[in-house]
Amino acid sequence: MSCPYAGNGNDHDDSAVPLTTEVGKIYGEYLMLDKLLDAQCMLSEEDKRPVHDEHLFIITHQAYELWFKQIIFEFDSIRDMLDAEVIDETKTLEIVKRLNRVVLILKLLVDQVPILETMTPLDFMDFRKYLAPASGFQSLQFRLIENKLGVLTEQRVRYNQKYSDVFSDEEARNSIRNSEKDPSLLELVQRWLERTPGLEETGFNFWAKFQESVDRFLEAQVQSAMEEPVEKAKNYRLMDIEKRREVYRSIFDPAVHDALVRRGDRRFSHRALQGAIMITFYRDEPRFSQPHQLLTLLMDIDSLITKWRYNHVIMVQRMIGSQQLGTGGSSGYQYLRSTLSDRYKVFLDLFNLSTFLIPREAIPPLDETIRKKLINKSV
């Protein structure tokens, strides 16, 4: 049956007049299916001992790599749009659309893992010997995704050698080096956040107003705690308020913030963090609606990559246990489990924004000057 969207929907109309006289490519030629469908070479079959599930293993990983290619394509286009001094609202909408596409692709990749889990550990053992020294650690495209997203080299868990050294191909190494040098999505989003309207000290000066609101909020909390009749409960509440004050100090004191960045506990510059907090507070304002969606999608991407890593870890443990080495010589399960930590979470600061929230009624109201400025559709 032919595709109803490609023609007039009549499978038997041999007299249909072509829409163009140019000779086009047919479906298989356009998609190069002869190459694509001939790329599943089962090593067990070459060894005259074919293992049925090796075919599933190959197909699943090839599908991953195809989707990785699309994610890289989307990331590169998004980085190009963000790498500008001014980003108008139409571009922000396109960035949101493409980030959402990446989110949907990652959801699909997470859902592919259960298909691979239909293979039992014994089935996997039947062909695992053919895989060495190949390893998922050698996926160039996944490393490029990490770098383009913003995973820092110093944040990576080392195993045996530097991650780029597993690639013997010089072209692959050049791709890795270029992806490390080019501005990552993290860096470009940071620059964009630093330009958030309303942060200017000579204008609305959101940061100063926010600090005043936090001081008033904490002071009200102290007054409420002092009225607590039970001494033990009062002391507990006062101690909790002091802890919260220290948490806020970590964002209001630039030196403390910078120390946390150097330690790897924060990613954004101090100015970018201010922008992210402002967008979060005023997300209901039309001007900040799309930026808030953008930040939410970045967290979704981080979350889904973590879920994919987790599913991969669990699958590896089911297939080879937690003591065996991986096929590429890595520590297998132990190495993969270590990648689930926050050090691999690129937009960690966005996840932690909720730490610094204050009640809605305490949020500094926007004045007419900043409201007029927010009508400007570019930033």
Swiss-Prot record:
Superkingdom of the source species: Eukaryota
Cofactor(s) the record lists: heme
Biological or metabolic pathway of the protein: Amino-acid degradation; L-tryptophan degradation via kynurenine pathway; L-kynurenine from L-tryptophan: step 1/2; Pigment biosynthesis; ommochrome biosynthesis
Catalytic activity of the protein: L-tryptophan + O2 = N-formyl-L-kynurenine
SUPFAM superfamilies: Indolic compounds 2,3-dioxygenase-like (SSF140959)
Sequence positions that bind heme: H312
E.C. numbers: 1.13.11.11
Segment forming the signal sequence: none
Pfam families cross-referenced by the UniProt entry: Trp_dioxygenase (PF03301)
GO terms for MF: heme binding; metal ion binding; tryptophan 2,3-dioxygenase activity
Cofactor note: Binds 1 heme group per subunit.
Keyword list, A-Z: Dioxygenase, Heme, Iron, Metal-binding, Oxidoreductase, Tryptophan catabolism
GO biological process, one term: L-tryptophan catabolic process to acetyl-CoA
Function noted in UniProt: Heme-dependent dioxygenase that catalyzes the oxidative cleavage of the L-tryptophan (L-Trp) pyrrole ring and converts L-tryptophan to N-formyl-L-kynurenine. Catalyzes the oxidative cleavage of the indole moiety.
Family statement: Belongs to the tryptophan 2,3-dioxygenase family.
Self-association state and partner proteins as the record states: Homotetramer. Dimer of dimers.
PANTHER family: TRYPTOPHAN 2,3-DIOXYGENASE
Name recorded for this polypeptide: Tryptophan 2,3-dioxygenase
Species assigned in the record: Drosophila sechellia
